[in-house]
Amino acid sequence: MILVLLGPPGSGKGTQGALLKSELSFEHISTGDMLRAEVSKKSPLGLKAEEYMKQGLLVPDDLIIAMIKNILTEAPHKNYVFDGFPRNVNQAEAFETMLNTMRLQVDKVFYFDLEDDVIIKRLSGRRVCPKCGATYNIYYQKPKNDTLCDNDATPLIQRDDDKEEVIVNRLRVYKEQTFPLIEYYKYKNKLFVVSADGTQEEVFEKLKSML
Ligand code: AP5
Ligand code: ZN
């Protein structure tokens, strides 16, 4: 089964993707996490991607599509949840072509609907563990010790693109480039709207009931 999580930055795609992985054994493919790993390795892809990511812009489609193609070619028949991909109509069309050649298709697209003021609060409050990747929020999901990761006591950091100036850009890019995918998948009868404004557990229950 192939699922896509679609929604504005901070709407909970990463959080729900991680739950689909831990609770239902989906392969969680987050293009954002993959790119951040390349950036911290300072690989050629990471160095290129960093220029775009720090400004809140999309990384060029050809780099992203090649990454996804590698994953699917290696293991085409797993249950996947894609988080943060596709991100524009061009990526969605390339994804469809790629899946067609493997006799696969996107089964369901979950659109996480959330108001801008909540988005901004979630993004500005997000803190992440640079060691294990765990995500926290100073407003909604505090670690036990204010500034340290619950798993390994590493000091938590703020993502560079969660700074206020970059958040504004990310929201603009989302509205211009990603939002049109809602109509794209609605037209294909694959779109399921999820109100993302509950607790993590509430949103996950809603998701499961729609699977
Ligand atoms: P990416 O990492 O994909 O960022 P994003 O889409 O902006 O999404 P986020 O990770 O910010 O938010 P999320 O929806 O996953 O929310 P989360 O669960 O973390 O992309 C980063 C960059 O990489 C892009 O700007 C671009 O440059 C590049 N990129 C990535 N994919 C690309 C692609 N396909 N094409 C081109 N470029 C690409 O939650 C956010 C916060 O809220 C957390 O603190 C969390 O604890 C909290 N939270 C979550 N759920 C709840 C809840 N129910 N209640 C209260 N708090 C909650
Ligand atoms: Zn940690």
Curated annotation (Swiss-Prot):
Species for this entry: Hydrogenobaculum sp. (strain Y04AAS1)
Physiological role: Catalyzes the reversible transfer of the terminal phosphate group between ATP and AMP. Plays an important role in cellular energy homeostasis and in adenine nucleotide metabolism.
Protein name stated in the entry: Adenylate kinase
Name of one Pfam family that matches: ADK
The protein's assembly and partners: Monomer.
Swiss-Prot/TrEMBL domain comment: Consists of three domains, a large central CORE domain and two small peripheral domains, NMPbind and LID, which undergo movements during catalysis. The LID domain closes over the site of phosphoryl transfer upon ATP binding. Assembling and dissambling the active center during each catalytic cycle provides an effective means to prevent ATP hydrolysis. Some bacteria have evolved a zinc-coordinating structure that stabilizes the LID domain.
EC number(s) from the headed UniProt entry: 2.7.4.3
Residues annotated to bind AMP: T31, R36, L57, L58, V59, G84, F85, P86, R87, Q91, R159, R170
PANTHER family registered for this protein in UniProt: NUCLEOTIDE KINASE
